[in-house]
């Protein structure tokens, strides 16, 4: 059954159905036309406040004289959302422009509702952020404070901790820990006092320990020197090779005061024998340049040398005597010659 658009029955049916659909908070109707209530309508629900009536057209109708659509502002004043009687009404400023939030460089996190008691009284109204449109006044006093642990309050203790210039003293670190953790303040104080007492107790003990150690080490060193000397003497008596090494070390320690230790060029001679051994061998060489086997064995036993060492020493001494005699002869000959 089709009704023409000019008939009032069709319009009333269309309007009533759309009003019932819109009051049931459904913005999309099943019919072919869409209706939104006028701004003057009293509606308890919050919704889009556009108004207008768009009737449906038949297939063959192009224009109609009664057809029209009244367009109203899409978002009216926010005051019409709620009744003035309600307690949750939000007062709006005159201008609808959202104020720009101007944050200072030092952003204080403590200006929120969860504020400490010591800073609440000092708060100035200018420091409250410009969200007065949403929050008309600061937090009421009835709200309980949120307990914030001590490690969240670093801003109060950072300045004091920074002035210590990163000292390595345990007292400074204990004070910083006291400021950072106010709950355990009594425990670090006791620990700091204990540290001071331990320092005082450790200082004299540490001062006495090095002296004791030095006293213990010095007798050991003093006692070790004669022991080493006696061991060296025993080894020298037992083996002539070790004795030769010992003689080299003694010669290296002694200054070259005598001529028999130094050569003509000033360098130190290679002398594997001790002074006592060389003196005994020199005496025997003055008596006899050539030794028999029996005499060589006797000298080797008296000087603690082997038979072969005594034999080599006499051979070297004879070669040295020949060289010295040759040099003396040449020197005498050159001194007598005169060059014209």
UniProtKB/Swiss-Prot annotation:
Which residue numbers delimit the DNA-binding region?
266-325
Q: Which SUPFAM superfamilies match?
A: Homeodomain-like
Task: Tell me the PROSITE patterns matching this sequence.
Answer: HOMEOBOX_1, HOMEOBOX_2
Give me the disulphide-bonded residues. none
Q: Where is this region: Disordered?
A: 199-227
Q: Which UniProt keywords apply?
A: Developmental protein, DNA-binding, Homeobox, Nucleus, Phosphoprotein, Transcription, Transcription regulation
Its biological function?
A: Sequence-specific transcription factor which is part of a developmental regulatory system that provides cells with specific positional identities on the anterior-posterior axis.
Q: Which SMART domains does UniProt cross-reference here? A: HOX
Mention one GO biological process in which this protein takes part, according to its record.
Answer: regulation of transcription by RNA polymerase II
Question: Where found in the cell?
Answer: Nucleus
Q: What protein family does this chain belong to? A: Belongs to the Abd-B homeobox family.
What is the species listed in this Swiss-Prot or TrEMBL entry?
Pan troglodytes (Chimpanzee)
Q: Does the record bear Transmembrane in its keywords? A: no
Q: Which GO terms describe its cellular component?
A: nucleus
- Principal place of residence: nucleus
Query: How is this protein named in the record?
Result: Homeobox protein Hox-D10
Q: Which residues carry this modification: Phosphoserine?
A: 238-239
> Among its keywords, does the record have Membrane?
no
Q: Name one Pfam family in it.
A: Homeodomain
For molecular function, the Gene Ontology terms on record are:
DNA-binding transcription factor activity, RNA polymerase II-specific; RNA polymerase II cis-regulatory region sequence-specific DNA binding
Compositionally biased tracts (Polar residues): 208-217
